[in-house]
Structure formats: structure tokens, C-alpha cells
Regions:
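A short acidic, Gly/Pro-enriched loop at the edge of an enzyme's catalytic core
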Residues: 175-182
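Mobile active-site "lid"/loop adjacent to the S-adenosyl-L-methionine
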Residues: 146, 185-223, 239-247
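S-adenosyl-L-methionine
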Residues: 152-175
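Polybasic, low-complexity RNA-engagement segments
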Residues: 1-38, 299-456
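Helix-to-beta-strand junctions that scaffold the AdoMet/dcAdoMet cofactor pocket
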Residues: 133, 228-229
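C-terminal catalytic and target-recognition region of SAM-dependent MTase-like enzymes
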Residues: 239-342, 350, 433
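Short Gly/Ser/Thr- and charged-rich N-terminal loops/segments
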Residues: 50-57
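Conserved class I S-adenosyl-L-methionine
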Residues: 111-118
Length: 456
């Protein structure tokens, strides 16, 4: 791998940059694979986090995150049913430092409104969701519609019920003044931190592109800043090494918005480079890709402008509610409403927030879609199968690995005859989706758009 000389020259003098070891690492071809476990996905009836050790080549723990692990090699995640069950997320190790940024600056035990502004494909959103309290609401946003669909799929797979997925430009959030307690901006960037992982990105790097990215990052931050509360926290990160997208942005935020910098404590053993009030991850010093992260606190308060609620979600009827309740383990604090294409469930406390977002944003998904009512019966949605709130009494069919892969390919599966009706397909007690057992056959209801296309 040949790194452009103009790129290397641009990094000279940057704290932590060692050209010799940096170039050597990129030539070595070494690849790092890491995962983050889903602490809420555990065998049905057992609420202990599941580490699929024996199934994945776990090497050791990532030191700055509770649920992160390095793998000895990269397996075929496509053919691991536990991946499709949402038991873990394949995520770059350096970016998991977000956990330290949040834990050290925010009381995560309190109910919070959190915005993940540039959220697709969902790594940071699923991470945030695992860290915040059940009474907190996460708005997970992606401006590009196709990527927003991928984000929605990953949110559903994670089993979240306190997340709203939106498809908005950052400027749209200016309408929600002083609304969020925490905003995470993993900004679009020139991508130099991923050169080792994605060598083709080298061809697209240029000084001009760095300048364009810096301007776009400033626009994004200026657009979203009004929606942050006074004393709120904004976490800014990139996968770029260029100071124009990193330290220069910090200086710009300090000067333009009087944003204060938050201090974080890190271990010297982690190999992370501290630059003023920010942190750089150099791949020749840490076991991860290139990454930059900093944390701002809003100390200047803008005047409030009341955001109007013009739309409200309509609750389903009492008889319909009685048809839905048996599918759920606990529905006491839940509200059942008519959504885009069926019945959705939300936490009652979130109703004002979701009505506000529904009135002012392009909401793509919220809460948990339960399904559709047909002939006074619920046709369950895939998202209900993925939800942690599904009742233990729901009938289940346990599959072996070969059967599970066939199910995920949306092929016919041979299982022992079972009681007719909707049944939950499981692998190692982890739900994968639905089948409907009929008298002479079994219908596979795994979503067509999620099916495995490759042969094992």
C-alpha cells in the first residue's frame, strides 16, 4: 500500500505521528477485527449477557469499552445465526471509545434525550442504546434514505424499544431548540483513518477534499448546535487524520459558539494520543483504526422558541389492545398506537416526544412495530421477534446451525410437526424470526430484504 506523499507531508508535526511506523503498519497488511456484544440479548428466560465464545475466535477485551472484544481472525459473520439475532455488532475498536466520552461526561442513569446525528449504519446508535437508561430516548438520524433503511434494520435487530429513527438533514434539527441533552456527531470526513481497512479510499483522498469536508463539518455542527440544551454535551468524532477536520474544528467551535471542552481521563496503557482537549488514535500505537474524538459542553443558552406539535399518534382501541397484550411480557407502561403500516408500541413517557418528532421530522421508525391486525388476530412483525419484550409464552422452534442458515436464506426447513399457528424460530435460544405452521407445511416469514443471498 503506497500512501500519497502529499498526505504524509500534511501530517508532519501532528502530535503522535511517526511516519516510519505509520507507513510500516500500512504496508504490513495487518487487519483488526472487533465486535461489541449486545448486553440485552441473552437466552430466553436468562438475563445474563451472552458471549458467543466457542463460536467466535475471541482474542481479548478492548480496554475502553465494557462489551468490546478483539477477534483472532475475521470469520464469516454472514453465516453466524447469532449475528442475525443481534447478539453482537461488528464494529471498529477505536470508535468504541465513545463509551468513555459518554460515561465520563454524562449521568447515564438519568432519563436523557440523545441524538445520533450521522447514525448509519448503526454502530454508534446501538452502542449508545446499550449505555443509556430505559427511560432515555435516542433519536437515530441518517440523511441518506438508503442508508437510513440499513440503520432501521440494525436498530430492529438490536431489539431496541426506546429509539426513533429519522431521515433528516442536520439543518432540520434547528427546529428543536434546546431539546437534546446529548448529541453525537460522527461527522462525514475524508476517511484517511480507514486507509488500512479500505485501501481504495486512498484514491479519493486530496487536500481539496479535506477542505470540503471541513466546511461540511462546520455546517453540520452549526445546524445542530441550537438543538442542544444548555449544559448539554456534544461528542464530535471523525475517522480522519487531518487537523483541518479535527483540531481546527475544535478551535472553530470554541470561537464561534463559545463551546467548552470536556476533560477525559485515559490510561497510558491504551496508547491513545491526547492533543489539547481531544484524542487521536494512531493505528501504529493502538489496536484499531485511525480515529479522532472530542467532547464539547454548551455553556451559552439561546432563547427558546416553542416547537409546535401538529400531528399526534392515535391509540388503538381497547379491544385491539387486548388482542396485542398476550404477545408481550410486560405492557403496563406501554402505549399501542397506529403507525405507518401497522400497530406500534412505545413507552407511555415517550408519547409527547414522539408526537413532537412526528410533527417536525421525517420519522422512519419508532418504538417496536408489533404487526398488523387481520381478522381479529395479530400478524406479528419481524421487529416483535427481535424485541426483548416478547412474551416467554410464545411458541418456539429451536433449530440447529444448518437449519438456521436455511431459514435465514428464506428456504424451506424440515422440522418436526408442531402445533399450528405462529411460532418463533430460535437458534441457541436466540430469536431469528417467525414461521407460520400450517397443517401440511411451514411458511417462512423471514423478511425478504434481510435474507442471506450467498450459499454456505
Amino acid at each position: 500500500m503506497q500512501l500519497p506523499s502529499v498526505f504524509l507531508d500534511s501530517l508532519k508535526g501532528t502530535k503522535g505521528f511517526d511516519q516510519t511506523t505509520f507507513e510500516k503498519l500500512h504496508v504490513s497488511g495487518e487487519q483488526i477485527t472487533s465486535i461489541r456484544l449486545n448486553p440485552s440479548k441473552s437466552p430466553i428466560g436468562n438475563h445474563q449477557p451472552c458471549l458467543p465464545a466457542g463460536r467466535l475466535p475471541i482474542e481479548n477485551k478492548i480496554p475502553w469499552t465494557e462489551q468490546g472484544y478483539y477477534l483472532k481472525e475475521r470469520p464469516s459473520f454472514t453465516f453466524d445465526p447469532l449475528f442475525h439475532a443481534g447478539c453482537y455488532y461488528v464494529q471498529e475498536a477505536s470508535s468504541m471509545f465513545l463509551e468513555q466520552a459518554l460515561k465520563q461526561t454524562v449521568d447515564l442513569s438519568k432519563p436523557l434525550r440523545v441524538l445520533d446525528l450521522c447514525a448509519a449504519p448503526g454502530g454508534k446508535s446501538t452502542h449508545i442504546q446499550s449505555l443509556i437508561s430505559p427511560g432515555s430516548l435516542l433519536v437515530s438520524n441518517e440523511v441518506i434514505k438508503s442508508r437510513c433503511n440499513i440503520l432501521k434494520d440494525n436498530i430492529i435487530k438490536w431489539g431496541c424499544e426506546n429509539v426513533v429513527v429519522t431521515n433528516n438533514d442536520p439543518k432540520d434539527f434547528a427546529k428543536l431548540e434546546n431539546y437534546f441533552d446529548v448529541i453525537v456527531v460522527d461527522a462525514p470526513c475524508s476517511g484517511s483513518g480507514l486507509f488500512r481497512k479500505e485501501p481504495d479510499a486512498i484514491e479519493h483522498w486530496s487536500e481539496n477534499n479535506v477542505a470540503l469536508c471541513s466546511q461540511r463539518q462546520q455546517r453540520i455542527l452549526a445546524d445542530v448546535w441550537p438543538s442542544l440544551k444548555e449544559d448539554g454535551i456534544l461528542v464530535y468524532s471523525t475517522c480522519s487524520y487531518s487537523k483541518e477536520e479535527d483540531e481546527d474544528i475544535v478551535k472553530w467551535m470554541n470561537e464561534k459558539f463559545l463551546a467548552a471542552n470536556c476533560q477525559l481521563l485515559i490510561s497510558e496503557n491504551w496508547g491513545i494520543t491526547k492533543t489539547d482537549n481531544s484524542f487521536r488514535f494512531w493505528p501504529d500505537k493502538v489496536k484499531g483504526e485511525g480515529f479522532f474524538i472530542t467532547v464539547f459542553k454548551k455553556v451559552h443558552h439561546e432563547d427558546d422558541h416553542k416547537t409546535r406539535v401538529t400531528k399526534r399518534l392515535n391509540e388503538i382501541s381497547a379491544p385491539q389492545t387486548e388482542l396485542v397484550k398476550p404477545w408481550l411480557t410486560n405492557s403496563g407502561d406501554k402505549l399501542f398506537v397506529h403507525g405507518f403500516d401497522g400497530i406500534y408500541m412505545i413507552n407511555k413517557d415517550f408519547q409527547p416526544d414522539i408526537n413532537l418528532l412526528y410533527s417536525n421530522m421525517r420519522v422512519a421508525y419508532f418504538g417496536v412495530k408489533l404487526g398488523e391486525l387481520m381478522k381479529a388476530k395479530l400478524v406479528p412483525a419481524h421487529s416483535l421477534a427481535m424485541s426483548r419484550l416478547l412474551a416467554d409464552s410464545v411458541m418456539k422452534i429451536e433449530l440447529n446451525r444448518e437449519q438456521a442458515i436455511r431459514y435465514l436464506q428464506k428456504k424451506d426447513i424440515d422440522v418436526e410437526k408442531s402445533q399450528p399457528g405462529w411460532q418463533l424460530i430460535c437458534f441457541n435460544n436466540h430469536p431469528l424470526g417467525w414461521v407460520k405452521v400450517l397443517q401440511n407445511r411451514l411458511n417462512n416469514y423471514y423478511p425478504m430484504e434481510l435474507r442471506i443471498l450467498k450459499d454456505n
